[in-house]
């Protein structure tokens, strides 16, 4: 019998950003006002020149203008806004230019440190430019010399925003309208890394000199309890230790505490800046070597090398009086100090699965 050809996995689908959705819907609403044309799809040009056609859910006149909506398609990316209705309401204005407003589900900036001034709707610069470019071209096409008031909204955006970093960044009332290329790349890390950078920038702009970068909820709780730090000082770095350390080169703070599970910290100690299991693994022989330098006997070293997990290796070392947690933190500290400016005072903390400190280095 002939063997079947193995099925090839389908390539992951790209999607479109909330900025692209806002551009398409604002253009459609404005076109209805200027040309009397109600589209069911609209073509937009992305920042790198690609032309894409975006389907609309509705395009209709309102009492004071027009509105259009589209369903956000993030492709195969697990985006919190995937499937959300993004809409624009456009009104014509006598004064030229484009003015942006936060509609339902779009947040407002309340803290300094972001790319937008306090009080502005959380519609980022590239989406603003995309909308402005398209609306100005439409106005020129129809000989219109006035301006536009553009209100962007996201259905259910206030609840969705609670699943993002917006509340901690001081963006209240909803989501941000984002995107630099107009395209969502599946499982891209860029949005998460951008939120890390924004968190640091907001902390700096609000006078916070001591930040704590944490790998998860347990480490965040440990830092909050240990130092009584405000939420604004807590940076949720996840696996992206390198994103924190490298950003501090150009945006330094006086003091950085890094805290994570023992396994995550052992990866950083070995020189890995991405702590995800896809990109780095725990080096048990290296842990055994460090334990040996602290006096571990041959039997303990062999047991550590044969351990199933880093937690097991840690418990073996603890039972023998070897301060493996402190050793790992000391090596992680050296890695961090090689990256951040000398002006940044750095310290490391490792916790176990119960959130208890098992190592520290300063």
From Swiss-Prot:
Broad EC category: transferase
GO molecular function: cobalt-precorrin-5B C1-methyltransferase activity
Pathway as given in its UniProt record: Cofactor biosynthesis; adenosylcobalamin biosynthesis; cob(II)yrinate a,c-diamide from sirohydrochlorin (anaerobic route): step 6/10
InterPro entries tied to this protein: CbiD, CbiD_sf
Record's keyword annotation contains Methyltransferase: yes
Enzyme Commission number(s) of this protein: 2.1.1.195
Keyword tRNA processing: no
Source superkingdom: Bacteria
Swiss-Prot/TrEMBL keywords: Cobalamin biosynthesis, Methyltransferase, S-adenosyl-L-methionine, Transferase
Gene3D superfamilies referenced in this protein's UniProt entry, alphabetically: CbiD-like (3.30.2110.10)
Pfam families in alphabetical order: CbiD (PF01888)
Catalytic activity entry: Co-precorrin-5B + S-adenosyl-L-methionine = Co-precorrin-6A + S-adenosyl-L-homocysteine
GO terms (BP aspect): anaerobic cobalamin biosynthetic process; methylation
Record-linked NCBIfam families: cbiD (TIGR00312), PRK00075.1-1 (NF000849)
Family of the protein in this entry: Belongs to the CbiD family.
Name under which the protein is recorded: Cobalt-precorrin-5B C(1)-methyltransferase
Taxonomic source organism: Burkholderia cenocepacia (strain HI2424)
């Amino acid at each position: 019998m002939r063997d079947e050809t193995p099925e090839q996995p389908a390539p992951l689908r790209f999607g479109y950003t909330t900025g692209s959705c806002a551009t398409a819907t604002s253009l459609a609403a404005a076109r209805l006002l200027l040309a009397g044309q109600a589209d069911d799809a609209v073509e937009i040009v992305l920042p790198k020149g690609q032309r894409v056609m975006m389907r609309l859910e509705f395009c209709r006149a309102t009492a004071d203008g027009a509105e259009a909506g589209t369903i956000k398609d993030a492709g195969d990316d697990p985006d919190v806004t995937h499937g959300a209705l993004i809409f624009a309401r456009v009104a014509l204005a006598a004064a030229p230019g484009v003015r942006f407003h936060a509609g339902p589900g779009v947040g407002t900036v309340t803290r300094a440190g972001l790319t937008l001034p306090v009080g502005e709707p959380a519609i980022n610069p590239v989406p603003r430019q995309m909308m402005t470019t398209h609306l100005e071209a439409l106005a020129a096409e129809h000989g219109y010399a006035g301006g536009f008031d553009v209100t962007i909204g996201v259905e259910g955006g206030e609840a969705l925003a609670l699943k993002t970093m917006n509340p901690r960044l001081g963006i209240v009332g909803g989501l941000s309208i984002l995107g630099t290329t107009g395209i969502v790349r599946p499982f891209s890390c860029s949005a998460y890394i951008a939120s890390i950078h924004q968190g640091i920038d907001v902390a700096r702009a609000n006078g916070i000199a001591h930040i704590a970068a944490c790998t998860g909820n347990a480490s965040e709780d440990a830092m909050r309890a240990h130092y009584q730090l405000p939420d604004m000082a807590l940076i949720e770095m996840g696996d992206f230790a390198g994103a924190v350390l490298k950003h501090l080169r150009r945006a330094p703070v006086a003091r950085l505490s890094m805290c994570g599970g023992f396994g995550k910290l052992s990866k950083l100690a070995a020189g890995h800046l991405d702590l995800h299991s896809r990109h780095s693994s725990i080096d048990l022989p290296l842990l055994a070597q460090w334990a040996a330098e602290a006096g571990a006997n041959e039997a303990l070293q062999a047991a550590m090398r044969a351990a199933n997990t880093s937690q097991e290796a840690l418990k073996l070392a603890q039972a023998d009086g070897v301060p493996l947690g402190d050793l790992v933190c000391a090596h992680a500290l050296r890695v961090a100090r090689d990256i951040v400016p000398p002006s940044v005072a750095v310290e490391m903390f490792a916790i176990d699965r119960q959130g208890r400190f098992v190592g520290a280095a300063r």
